[in-house]
């Protein structure tokens, strides 16, 4: 299926065209093409080994492609030395100089070096920006992981680059610090308006922070779109499986928009793929548990197997009648349970809305 890019018609700041990178017989990046608008925040999302870090390294000039082209602000930088590309970069490991103070780390790339007063002013400005005022004289060893990453971000922004590259900058931090820095990073990027590309394998991180998400798999771009497009309208089976939780139902085609799952015939709001064997997909939060039975399209009975409280959502495991061997996962808000207490063994009506069902060719693997 062709990758979807809903913003491809807008003006671009960075573009890559048909980039390829091979390491012997292994293809790390295969014909990757992408366009990024000025001021946009884009996340490269995918499993380990999918090519996302390779793509970022090629853009940074830390590696060279075997084929393809990279353009930044209209300038071909495919073979340009890293120092002559207009970007700042933050690594997962911080990469701070342990023998230099915070101020000297941040000012390292500033020129001319003799302008000490100007550099000191810029350092103070950046430390205020990243929430570390008064830290100029400290050394990296005196800072927490989150503070070190703030210093690394300040250093990357010191030269006011047109492009900010982030290589999994939050993955080494604990969950609470990571969530806080994620919010700060998003707010800072919005205020500065700097074009940003971030590599991550954390789908929640990508969906919450990015203007657009680029999902990668096996060296190829599977889909490009807004977080909502990626989550609600996955362009391929891989994207649907990788981003978010899902129910997978093996089905057989019955007509243009009908498919049979066991003894149940379900309607879909869109045409089915041209295949007899199908897999239907629906998110757990889209499964509707009804308070009482009433005959309706895509509505069936299911036995409650398990009820698990999850804070904002309560998770259910349901065994639908007429679908032997299948378990449906549903997520409902606790307020619904206040009106309709559920216990294992109870039979409840369940609706699988036609608008939320999607079909992919082939039998379910999960």
Curated annotation (Swiss-Prot):
One GO CC term, this protein: ATP-binding cassette (ABC) transporter complex
Main subcellular location: membrane
Sequence positions that bind ATP: 46-53
EC number from the UniProt entry: 7.3.2.3
Reaction(s) the record says it catalyses: sulfate(out) + ATP + H2O = sulfate(in) + ADP + phosphate + H(+); thiosulfate(out) + ATP + H2O = thiosulfate(in) + ADP + phosphate + H(+)
Occurrences of domain ABC transporter (ranges): 14-243
Membrane topology: Peripheral membrane protein
InterPro entries linked: AAA+_ATPase, ABC_SmlMolc_Importer, ABC_transporter-like_ATP-bd, ABC_transporter-like_CS, AminoethylPonate_ABC_PhnT2, Mo/tungstate-bd_C_term_dom, P-loop_NTPase, Transp-assoc_OB_typ2
MF term (GO), any: ATP hydrolysis activity
Places the protein is found: Cell inner membrane
Pfam families, per the entry: ABC_tran, TOBE_2
Superkingdom of origin: Bacteria
Keywords from the named record: ATP-binding, Cell inner membrane, Cell membrane, Membrane, Nucleotide-binding, Sulfate transport, Translocase, Transport
Keyword Transcription regulation: no
Entry similarity comment: Belongs to the ABC transporter superfamily. Sulfate/tungstate importer (TC 3.A.1.6) family.
Subunit: The complex is composed of two ATP-binding proteins (CysA), two transmembrane proteins (CysT and CysW) and a solute-binding protein (CysP).
Function: Part of the ABC transporter complex CysAWTP involved in sulfate/thiosulfate import. Responsible for energy coupling to the transport system.
Protein name: Sulfate/thiosulfate import ATP-binding protein CysA 2
Organism: Chromobacterium violaceum (strain ATCC 12472 / DSM 30191 / JCM 1249 / CCUG 213 / NBRC 12614 / NCIMB 9131 / NCTC 9757 / MK)
Gene for this chain: cysA2
């Amino acid at each position: 299926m062709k990758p979807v890019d809903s913003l491809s018609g807008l003006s671009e700041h960075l573009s890559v065209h048909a980039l390829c990178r091979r390491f012997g017989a292994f293809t790390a990046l295969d014909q990757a093409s992408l366009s990024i608008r000025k001021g946009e925040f884009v996340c490269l999302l995918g499993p380990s080994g999918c090519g996302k870090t390779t793509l970022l390294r090629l853009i940074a000039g830390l590696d060279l492609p075997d084929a393809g082209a990279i353009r930044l602000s209209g300038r071909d930088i495919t073979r340009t030395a890293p120092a002559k590309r207009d970007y700042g970069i933050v690594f997962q490991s911080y990469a701070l100089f342990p023998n230099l103070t915070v101020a000297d780390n941040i000012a390292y790339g500033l020129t001319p070096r003799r302008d000490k007063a100007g550099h000191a002013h810029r350092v103070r400005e950046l430390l205020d920006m990243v929430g570390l005022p008064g830290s100029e004289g400290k050394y990296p060893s005196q800072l927490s992981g989150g503070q070190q990453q703030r210093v690394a971000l300040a250093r990357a922004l010191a030269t006011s680059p047109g492009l900010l590259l982030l290589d999994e900058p939050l993955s080494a931090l604990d969950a609470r610090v990571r969530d806080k820095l994620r919010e700060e990073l998003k707010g800072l990027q919005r205020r500065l308006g700097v074009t940003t590309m971030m590599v991550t394998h954390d789908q929640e991180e990508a969906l919450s922070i990015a203007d657009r998400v680029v999902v990668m798999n096996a060296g190829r771009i599977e889909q490009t779109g807004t977080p909502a497009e990626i989550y609600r309208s996955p362009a391929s089976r891989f994207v649907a499986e990788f981003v978010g939780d899902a129910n997978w139902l093996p089905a057989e085609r019955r007509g243009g928009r009908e498919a049979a799952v066991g003894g149940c015939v379900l309607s879909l709001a869109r045409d089915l793929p041209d295949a007899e064997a199908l897999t239907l997909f629906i998110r757990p939060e889209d499964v509707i548990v009804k308070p009482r039975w009433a005959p309706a399209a895509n509505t069936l009975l299911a036995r409650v197997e398990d009820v698990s409280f999850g804070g904002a959502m309560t998770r259910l495991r349901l065994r639908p009648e007429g679908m032997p061997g299948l378990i449906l996962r549903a997520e409902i808000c606790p307020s619904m349970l206040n009106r309709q207490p559920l216990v294992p063994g109870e039979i409840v009506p369940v609706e699988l809305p036609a608008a939320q069902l999607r079909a992919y060719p082939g039998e379910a693997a999960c």
